[in-house]
């Protein structure tokens, strides 16, 4: 299987902002991150619509064209309530990785991705080099819900011995 991987993406689910209320005056939110058959989950943060997760989840990348999908839920005793979803295209991040940029100052911005009708970006997303790593800061507007945004930070990780991107 390792031969098919092109790299890893560390997805830091930083926080939720103004998430929907699904319980009495609040929610107990968590995020599921999916890519292809992979499914990862943050911890549940109790009684808040502005959770601070800072949970780091790692996705194995085989095909960068497959979008990363986020689903936000309110943890309940019986059935968890949906609190919105979003998709993220990681191809812009991979394009910067392919440039193999070296020797630049920390936090040098290499690319910006602007919000449009084809993506879930709430604001411009920057891809930059930090400590020799390619990173991307993202704020996603949740769909299929009245309100809410999720802040992420992505970081590309090369796999020694893989074919790379």
Curated annotation (Swiss-Prot):
C2 domain sequence ranges: 1-105
Effect noted on mutating residue 60 to A: Abolishes binding to YCHF1, but no effect on phospholipid binding
Impact after mutating residue 146 to A: Abolishes phospholipid binding, but no effect on binding to YCHF1
PROSITE patterns the UniProt entry points to: C2
Subunit structure, as described in the record: Binds to PYR/PYL/RCAR abscisic acid intracellular receptors in an ABA-independent manner, both at the plasma membrane and in the nucleus. Interacts with YchF1.
Family indicated by similarity: Belongs to the plant CAR protein family.
Lineage: Eukaryota, Viridiplantae, Streptophyta, Embryophyta, Tracheophyta
Positions contributing to Ca(2+) 2 binding: 23, 28, 74-76
UniProt-reported outcome of changing residue 39 to A: Abolishes binding to YCHF1, and partial loss of phospholipid binding
MF terms (GO), sorted A to Z: GTPase activator activity; lipid binding; metal ion binding
Outcome recorded upon mutating residue 28 to A: Abolishes phospholipid binding, but no effect on binding to YCHF1
Protein name: GTPase activating protein 1
One of the record's GO cellular component terms: plasma membrane
Result for mutant: residue 141 to A: Abolishes phospholipid binding, but no effect on binding to YCHF1
Induction remarks: By wounding.
Organism of provenance: Oryza sativa subsp. japonica (Rice)
Effect upon mutating residue 37 to A: Abolishes binding to YCHF1, and partial loss of phospholipid binding
Keywords: Abscisic acid signaling pathway, Calcium, Cell membrane, Cytoplasm, GTPase activation, Lipid-binding, Membrane, Metal-binding, Nucleus, Plant defense
Binding site for Ca(2+) 1: 22-23, 74, 76, 81
Name of the gene: GAP1
Effect in UniProt of substituting residue 123 to A: Abolishes phospholipid binding, but no effect on binding to YCHF1
Keyword Endoplasmic reticulum on entry: no
The protein's role, per its UniProt record: Mediates the transient calcium-dependent interaction of PYR/PYL/RCAR abscisic acid (ABA) receptors with the plasma membrane and thus regulates ABA sensitivity. Stimulates the GTPase/ATPase activities of YCHF1, and regulates its subcellular localization. Binds phospholipids in a Ca(2+)-independent manner. Promotes tolerance towards salinity stress by limiting the accumulation of reactive oxygen species (ROS). Promotes resistance to bacterial pathogens, such as Xanthomonas oryzae pv. oryzae and Pseudomonas syringae pv. tomato strain DC3000.
Places the protein is found: Cell membrane; Nucleus; Cytoplasm, Cytosol
Effect of residue 149 to A: Abolishes phospholipid binding, but no effect on binding to YCHF1
Impact after mutating residue 58 to A: Abolishes binding to YCHF1, but no effect on phospholipid binding
Main location: membrane
């Amino acid at each position: 299987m390792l031969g098919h991987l092109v790299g890893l993406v560390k997805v830091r689910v930083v926080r939720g902002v103004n998430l929907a209320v699904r319980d009495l005056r609040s929610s107990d939110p968590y995020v599921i991150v999916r890519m292809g058959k992979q499914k990862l989950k943050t911890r549940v943060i109790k009684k808040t619509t502005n959770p601070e997760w800072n949970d780091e989840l790692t996705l194995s990348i085989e095909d960068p064209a497959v979008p990363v999908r986020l689903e936000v839920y309110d943890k309940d005793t019986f059935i968890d309530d949906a609190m919105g979803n979003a998709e993220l295209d990681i191809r812009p991040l991979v394009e910067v990785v392919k440039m193999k940029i070296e020797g630049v100052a920390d936090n040098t911005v290499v690319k910006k991705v602007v919000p449009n009708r084809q993506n879930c970006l709430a604001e411009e997303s920057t891809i930059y080099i930090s400590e020799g790593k390619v990173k991307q800061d993202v704020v996603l507007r949740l769909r299929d819900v009245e309100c809410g945004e999720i802040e992420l930070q992505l970081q590309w990780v090369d796999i020694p011995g893989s074919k790379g991107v």
